[in-house]
């Protein structure tokens, strides 16, 4: 009986430990600001647009000073193998692969984006450290990620903001 209780306790401790380490299982509190709501709506509308038009929607999503790309708010699209299909703010990254890239704290945030898109909910918030435009020092950034299909290919679309 003691042995069974010990095994059950070890399993419980392991699950709690995994939840603390895995940001997809146990995220910090998702942002609830007005900006967060705007980002979430933007990503959901972009997913619908891309699902309907496919890659033909990309030129529209790249337009600066539009509803899709304004200031430091822009969209990015990856397939679930971490290949960059669209990055409105950093077009040179398109066609590259983000596998293994870490933020300033060593977090594999691209991996976390993919895990969020694959999660049972299919969408949610991921936080990471990333420099603000024109800066080199990383700041906390939140990205809302949503999984969707791009011409039958499982993909994700996301956008983020700096909370400070």
Regions from the PLM with identified roles:
Residues 2-6, 11-164:
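N-terminal membrane-sensor/transducer module of prokaryotic signaling receptors
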